[in-house]
Amino acid sequence: MKPMGGTELQMAYLQKFVDKELLDKVQITTSVPEKIPLAKDKPNILWQKNAWDQPNIHPWFKDKSNHSKYDWYVFNSHWNYEHYTKFFDLPTIKCVVIKNGIDNIPAREKPFHPKRDKCRIIHHCTPWRGLNVLLGAMELIKDPMIELDVYSNCEVYGKDFAEANDPSYQKLYDQAKRLKNVNYIGYKSNEYIKRHLKDYNMFVYPSIWEETFCISLLESMAAGLFCITTNYG
């Protein structure tokens, strides 16, 4: 299974909607500088979606001699752009912001009546971004009309990544399985999630991770869900 996180989803959209001949005229590297060799015969673009302080990114940007290697730096949010230009003095003349995009997601049609309907909550983020906080909150909730479905593990970044990292979060998965008001489902594809967002009333994401542009939140908002999250990032 290939990784299909936010970066991969955005690249798939780009390849779907932009003419291949045009894309072939540039070389686009996503997030990690020089993970593919720089092209000598076409413009080099670094499409930056990761936060400025990531250990596989920070040292490269801190060395200003690297800044001339790319012709353009494209950021997925103004927040991300501002951090890179502030902390690394990246030349703004080479920087541009193109925000993340999503498919057209039909909004849920059935109205939610809190006194009559069960409140169905979805959480579909990686486990290190606040799942521990959310499960702690669910332990305190005693109302039987509130139920959480958790689509969270490391498989979104591929099976090799999951095998190496899922054991670190097994206690969280076990906690989710023990709670009566939580259904631990694990990984489902982005297409599956988008099809089923209409079945939920609320998306809850108590992020402890600095998001650069949260796609899961954007999709949930587009589907008409009530959304609760932090302003971290």
Feature annotation, model-predicted:
Residues Q27-N56, H67, D71-F75, V96-K99:
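Active-site proximal beta-strand in glycosyltransferases
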Residues D71-T85, L90-R108:
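Donor nucleotide-sugar binding/catalytic pocket of nucleotide-sugar-dependent glycosyltransferases
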Residues H113-G130, L135-E139, D149:
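Conserved donor-binding/catalytic core segment of Leloir-type glycosyltransferases
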Residues A162-E191:
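Nucleotide-activated donor-binding/catalytic signature segment of Leloir-type glycosyltransferases, i.e.
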Residues K194, L217-A222:
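Short alpha-helical segment that forms part of, or immediately flanks, the ligand-binding pocket
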Residues R195-Y200:
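Short alpha-helical donor nucleotide-sugar binding micro-motif in glycosyltransferases
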Residues F226-T229:
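Short hydrophobic beta-strand element within catalytic cores of glycosyltransferases
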